[in-house]
Amino acid sequence: LAGYADLDGIEIEVFYPNDGTSEIQHLQMATQKGENVQVYAVQGNFDDAQTGVKKVFADADVAAELEKRGIRLSSANSINWGRLVPQIVYYFYAYFRLAEQGAVEWGKPVDFCVPTGNFGDILAGYYAKQMGLPVGRLVCASNKNNVLTDFLRTGTYDARRTFYKTTSPSMDILISSNLERLLYHVSGSSEKVAGWMQELSATGKYTVDAETLAKIQQSFAAGYADDADGAAEIKARFDGDHYLCDTHTAVAFRVAETRRTDAPMVVLSTASPFKFPRDVLTALGVEAPASDFAAMAALTAGTGAEAPASLRELDKLEVRFKTVLQPADIRTAALR
């Protein structure tokens, strides 16, 4: 939002799951300045919001109507492959840093553990590997919504399960869009992938063939951690290393501990702990205030870590966007 605000020739609409973000995340979006910006909460979870947006992208009538106005839709999340391109870079950066520090011999493999729900960030690591980076295993770290863990272990993707709201909300996803891309690269068959996706849409489940699963497991491993595991990891990392991590990174740390080999492993940290200050405080054994902003101040006082100014000042900004849509209304909003 901030990157595209008030850019000529670009209009921005953001759809996010109502009650599926922290207070800080919500205010980052709802207070965003810019004449070309519109933000909508969607009643439901991330899957409801993303599925609604993907339906709009696939709607030929919407595309035709917008074409008349000289408008073409694009996406800033990983619906758009361009979202993955900058993520590829830090796999190379991390490897080069390790090599320069002597932690790994040039050309020797390094494993990466990635907290993910939509499979985008970890897919960027797969692309880095395909480009020649010596990536060993890509370890997919899930929270209690562990549909990816089950798939990577068994080859069966079954979204017909309870949806859990966790302390790592950006991973609260049951339909992982980017997995479809991996299936295409591994199977080499658009017909197979289309069949699996149609089966998922119709039944909520699909199973890949043994050859496809074997190829996936050559590059990927998986594990999951629940909220209690993550909280324990936040405290352990701070007490042991004085490293303050967020709830998503904590999931990856816990999974990394269970999936270690002799190869060096990099844990990808994907969010600031100050976006989830109440949960981080609670994990550290401190009673958290009701407000995220009071919790942010308490987290700074208790750890010495400084919250980004852009987050500290959010409660002083005007809330510009308050509309809550049903998923079926996303199409109408896109045509406004």
Regions found by a protein language model. Give the residues of each.
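PLP-dependent amino-acid enzyme catalytic core
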Residues: 1-336
